[in-house]
Amino acid sequence: YINYKNMSHQHMLTLFNLLPVGSNISIWWNFGSMLLTCLMIQIATGFFLAIHYTANINLAFSSIIHISRDVPYGWIMQNTHAIGASLFFICIYIHIARGIYYGSYLNKEVWLSGTTLLIILMATAFFGYVLPWGQMSFWAATVITNLLTAIPYLGTTLTTWLWGGYAINDPTLTRFFALHFILPFAIISMSSIHILLLHNEGSNNPLGTNSDID
């Protein structure tokens, strides 16, 4: 009698054990690659959602309902995109916490590129939150964009420019959709720079042991 279940289990363990990573780093170093996976999922689902979305204040909410109810597998795309965004932030906060705990901020170029990534990511998430144009979307757009008015001299002009008028209206939603669509490409570019800078100097070494110790 051959226990194939145990054999497959052993093969799976072998695959993980063959991962070419030194024992001087831990599970907390997984979150960078997890973030890259999240980014790919968000771009893939976001593309299919953008095909069916309508950036108009009278039709935006209805188009979301249409995606969830009428588009084949639209509900999966919509839910994956929404929940994926939350997962993205969970991963990035753990990634940052690990960096703070183990002193990754000493690698200034990598840390500053990561900080820039976080700012772009938060902006992208905000623009995406507004897109369904429900009650909370409208409230968020009003409150957050009004913060620009706190900037001396330029505040009111900047807010009017961002809104596309003297109040939040259709032009606001259109430009928010355009920004939400274009910013992920900035995230991809910045992520590439972040990874290149990291591989240029290497990750920090919490145990202080040789990476080839295994």
Curated annotation (Swiss-Prot):
The cytochrome bc1 complex contains 3 respiratory subunits (MT-CYB, CYC1 and UQCRFS1), 2 core proteins (UQCRC1 and UQCRC2) and probably 6 low-molecular weight proteins. InterPro entries: Cyt_b/b6_N, Cytb/b6-like_sf, Cytochrome_b_N_euk/bac, Di-haem_cyt_TM. Heme b b566 binds at residues 95, 194. This is Cytochrome b. One of its GO terms (biological process) is mitochondrial electron transport, ubiquinol to cytochrome c. Component of the ubiquinol-cytochrome c reductase complex (complex III or cytochrome b-c1 complex) that is part of the mitochondrial respiratory chain. The b-c1 complex mediates electron transfer from ubiquinol to cytochrome c. Contributes to the generation of a proton gradient across the mitochondrial membrane that is then used for ATP synthesis. It comes from the Eukaryota. The keyword Heme applies. One of its GO terms (cellular component) is mitochondrial inner membrane. Its cofactor is heme b.
